[in-house]
Amino acid sequence: MYQKILTKDKDLLGINETCEGMGCVINLIKSKAAPLSVQTQRKCITSNFLKCSFDLEKLDPWFFCYQFNEGRYFAQQINKYYQGNTLSVKKLNIKSVGEVNIQLPDIQKQRLIGSIYRQAIRQRYLMIGQAENIANATFETLRKMEEDY
């Protein structure tokens, strides 16, 4: 669900700028959630996605994404749904997502957890980008060495 961050202007993940009050999008095929960003808030979504809106005083979007993507309690509930699914392609539907329960700590703790999750994802993608840059520089050096002999 998460894509490589290119620039602040192309922040499709919402890592730099989330759209406060806009909620999240759930990919029903991959069973992954991502907060809406300023860049994605007005985009049309297909039937493979579900747009979720919620009261920001009760549920933090990044906390929701953390619970949906990484939480064991969510995973157990989603796996129960998959066990009854005989399709070769496992896909969530609106009804199954609506039946999933979430345990909510107070909003301050949600915001803290959501903020840490957001930062961890940002760090991961920055590190992946750095590793790609190092690999590309190494390959370019090897090509130049190859030309010299």
Language model features: what each stretch is:
Residues 11, 31-34, 41-42, 55-58, ...:
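Short, charged/polar surface micro-motifs in flexible loops or helix N-caps
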Residues 61-65, 93-132:
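Amphipathic alpha-helical segments
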